[in-house]
């Protein structure tokens, strides 16, 4: 039968970070204790909605078409504190600010597809999606790349970019090798997000006056959307042009799955066909009506190793220096503001099944999965949960038939589910370990000099602090509630 489905996941993703101050970190941050430990901070636990709508239309016994609007199953918006209280109740700049303070956006993939039974019991499908994305991220950087600086030296940066064409292609097949066993395979390729936009800056945002009294009179705002980059200085006129100065590129991994499904019919296929024949109708398999239960095992792969970095670029000179000024201070926006990730491919195992308690009326289901870690400890971050994960889910479907004619397929289906994911901790607590440095507004730390477009004489990358800001322990937990409604006809 044909059907239209509307559903939404409600995602609660909780992330916490217990930062450790690097041994060579010379910044003056009163939040760190004598052992370099910062207070544990967590994101706000806010529900993120992930709605989906789709439909399939049966053209004939062999051909069907479908359309779908779906977003990635991710944690969505994240809000971290700009300021936290120390042991005396005094508000200070938050310890995770160099990694993330805000994350929000919209990524949607309208998709159309077609499926055809090319041979008896062999079905193939192909789909094409046209995605678009609007992304907002905020974090802190340091202005002067030097020692002995306080949070007064920090700049709050708010990046906003968009990409209105992200092509996606997927293909799959399903072979019913016996009346009780199906095997299937699926592959998906998605182009990288290649977004354009601008960045807004706020200097002196993390001062004690703003933290403790909300006094933002010293905050200097700028934005690369303006011709003078928002500095208000005549000498900067034209440096930011007409905007669109930020270029962001993020690879989206290829994915593939193979699976096998066993289903136990209530009656044999021959008997089901015999029962359908007197009514003059052909037999069409309906798992909720015809099966007692099913169980499925899937193996999954995601090419996350394609994500070496979140690539963030701004206009620069031929020598690698940033060309865009920051309002209120003597520094510039780095031409190369990439955020390293160096992910690994992810492999997973998923198992689940349905048990039809009431034929053609009520099904209960359960499943579980495990996936390997994508992230490496050296590059750990609080934006995406990239550690090993184990999860389970429970749910069910209740069908309400419309009309009393058994030959008709019209029905309403109500679906609900709950899932929980356990994440392994990401931990790197050696204060002498390497990690991800913060961005800086001047090229090299201390007395180091520029030796190349992206290097300083001390061997470090330009426009980066001399110390990492991601050391510590990151924990994650996720709960997902799913509700849906379908009409089949």
What are these regions (language model features)?
Residues 48-489:
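Outer-membrane beta-barrel porins/channels
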